[in-house]
Amino acid sequence: MSLFTMNEGYGYNDIYSLEESRVTDALKSFKEKVVYLFKRSNEMIVISKNGVTNNAVKQDVEKTANFIEKDIKTVENSNEVSREDLTTLERFKKRLEDKLEKWDKEIKELKFKDEGIGTKVINTIKWSFIQLKRIFTKILKLLVSAISAIYNKIRGVD
């Protein structure tokens, strides 16, 4: 048994390791929230197709989108970003683009003919698609700006 033990809670942390942990925490949070946002958006679409609007789900999706924006800005404004972080952001960018294309197709295919469904339900479904598309487009724009900022930092262009 040694006389001295090292406690991780009191270890030496320099500025770079703190910055790196802040970036990795933001990326982990970003990943979790994007997955959660995809799940909730699918729930929102299913609920709106049934003709019932749920304000709690809409607010939850909006709040999650705002958290994602904060995480993206944290990563974008950091000084220490690796190429792995960049590829992670690019993968999420591709996922969002695919999701938006899928929703565009679904919106175009929404045609209710003689099924007895009222215009209120149709408008609700279209509204939910438009709101989700707006949120994901906003996140996509932030991702693109973050990726370009990270590329410039890696290349040394300010």
Task: Describe each model-derived feature in a short phrase.
Residues 3, 21-46:
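Terminal accessory regions that mediate trafficking to/through membranes and regulate activation
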Residues 43-58, 74-86, 111-115:
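Charged, low-complexity interaction regions
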Residues 1-25:
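Short, conserved micro-motifs composed of acidic
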Residues 16, 21, 62, 73, ...:
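Intrinsically disordered, low-complexity regions of eukaryotic proteins
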Residues 26-38, 55-69:
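Short amphipathic alpha-helical heptad-repeat segments
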Residues 27, 34, 38, 85-158:
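Membrane- and interface-active hydrophobic/amphipathic segments that mediate membrane binding, fusion
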Residues 34, 41-44, 68-75, 103, ...:
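Non-transmembrane amphipathic alpha-helical segments
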